[in-house]
UniProtKB/Swiss-Prot annotation:
Its main location: cytoplasm. Homodimer. Pfam families: Anticodon_1, tRNA-synt_1g, tRNA_bind. It comes from Psychrobacter cryohalolentis (strain ATCC BAA-1226 / DSM 17306 / VKM B-2378 / K5). This is Methionine--tRNA ligase. The keyword Lipid metabolism does not apply. The gene is metG. Binds 1 zinc ion per subunit. InterPro entries: aa-tRNA-synth_I_CS (IPR001412), Anticodon_Met (IPR041872), M/V/L/I-tRNA-synth_anticd-bd (IPR013155), Met-tRNA-synth_bsu_C (IPR004495), Met-tRNA_ligase_1 (IPR023458), Met-tRNA_synth (IPR014758), Methionyl/Leucyl_tRNA_Synth (IPR015413), MetRS_core (IPR033911). Residues 598-700 form the tRNA-binding domain. ATP binds at K344. CDD domains: Anticodon_Ia_Met, MetRS_core, tRNA_bind_EcMetRS_like.
Amino acid sequence: MKVREILVTSALPYANGDIHLGHLVEYIQTDIWVRSMKAQGHKVTYVCADDAHGTAIMLKAEDNGVTPEQQIANVQAAHEADFAKFLINFDNYHSTHSEENREFSELIYRRLRDAGHISTRDVEQLFDPEKQLFLADRFVKGTCPECAATDQYGDNCEVCGTTYDATELKNPYSTLSNATPILKTSKHYFFDLPEFEQFLKDWTRSDNRLQTSVANKLQEWFDAGLTSWDISRDAPYFGFQIPDTPSDEPDKYFYVWLDAPVGYMASFQNLCDKRAGTEEALDFDHYWAQENEHKTEVYHFIGKDIVYFHALFWPAMLAGSELRTPTGVFAHGFLMVNGEKMSKSRGTFIKADTYAEHLHPEYLRYYFASKLSDKVEDINLDLEDFMQKVNSDLVGKVVNIASRSAGFLVKKYDGMLTDVCAEPSLLEDITKTGDEIAAAYENREFSRAMRLIMQCADKANEYIDDKKPWALAKVEGAEQEVQDVCSVAINIFRQLMVYLAPVLPELTANAKEFLNIDDLSFASRNEWLLGHQINKFKPLMQRIEEKDIAAMVEDSKASLTQVGAPTASQDDKAAAKNTSPAAMPSSTEQADYIGIEDFAKVEMKVAHVIACNHVEGADKLLQFTLDVGEAQPRNVFSGIRKFYEPEQLQGKKVICVTNLAPRKMKFGISEGMVLSSGDPKTGLVVITLPDEAVIGDSLA
């Protein structure tokens, strides 16, 4: 067998919050894949890091009264502790706020710039005339244009929940100097993504780099036309300064999404430095140099919401800077709990630490494995099904094989297994199934692998039920048959431990001690345990109790009063507004009514603006890339260009009408409508939602 050299990454968790079960889908999926490939004899390295840059980090640190550096250090320690609880076995865990990441970010930028792939243009923003700097929304305060509450931030009102643009604030002032800000233009740096369109079309369709559904979605983006990507941000900003900018101009910083994927390289370089001079030494260029692209493999596991960055920007950046591109990018769906999006009020927004206080992490690892496939599909953590499946499959089927057999062997035969297998055809069948299981693991068809493993467990239990060793033990002269039956059962149990080791590393480590063996690699399944002595059996796994799940849910519940949630007085205000004379047509007016059935046909969802760009050749359009909670983002055109710069809308949550028929336009296909209010002639305002709005939720 040829030993493959593989580098694997998971997307970097953001360093301003806790790890929750939704995050863990990806890290558990990646860890299982890495462990399975290592078990099959390949050389696999798994690296990750905290994504530690951006305005949000800076503001979080300010709220906590610490420096950004201390903030990200505290969060990284918490993240690593959570990952360890769930047995995520990184070879290295680093931070994007590192010298390695700075060096690689600057290297890539300079190579792109020198090759002519970087350009500049002016963007209009609020500016502090005293501090002489551009202001992010959270550095502007003023009077809310809706409810007149004072001292509200430049993106939303914490009193009435209204969201708005910073330029709409009344009596605005800079939180840094108290000065009244002015509108001013700023030079921003752009990466010329359209130059790489043909390369990306070829790359996304070659060598099975992407899942088919992802490649198809990318084709829609190609049809709509790629646009240049703003890679710069103005100070104040926590991140890396863009090098070599004119000395007479304000400092510019790399946008967090430029240096975040570079963090994969930085973490790997950090590991290379740690292992230098050891038997496990790694050569950075062996994995990342362009000429070695077909010698080694690089895989990124990501969520479906960041495909745009990993399948377009990232490979284009790498190709433009003469570095190797990923062998594959694997996207997964989101996590639902009890068929709905995670909810703090229902107690289903469950943090990793809260789960681990109540339940064993391997329960979740197995349940996720039983649900995950190679498709970009959401998975559902049904808590009742979770309890039943773990109790039935792991405790009732797998562990039960050992507990039913080991006692007879230890008590009557000093733990010795027979020298000859009494059921070679049965054991050969289960051994050969290992080939299918190994292939399912490699292809990320974990649910298929779990089904195959449980079929093997069923065969073992059927065999034990048929032979009834507990009854044979009472029959004089049947001692050899009892030993034969129990030895076959223990051998099958051993095979199941080989197959489950990538999913249940702690259970299988304990099983190795019981089985008195050192190796659970896939190759070891071909060597049956004959004339072998096992140790006394100890319980390997406990059943999940309903009370433990209930306690976890209760601990996860948050207060129903959240920032931006309507209060009674706000509801009264809304009701008053809707029943005012201006809002109610008189009995003599002939209003054009529609029935509730007609209105119900309109599907409106919360959408996150992944990207917003100008449309070359269209003076009225902006192009949105929207995450509406589906398998792939949507492309939507909106005629609001003269009222907004793209940067004002990127990252916002907006309302998208999602069941409009796709409209073919000169510049591509529009797959929905972004809702705005106002007069198209005098001014349109995009309706934005609070951060608490859940992507993909329907408006009611």
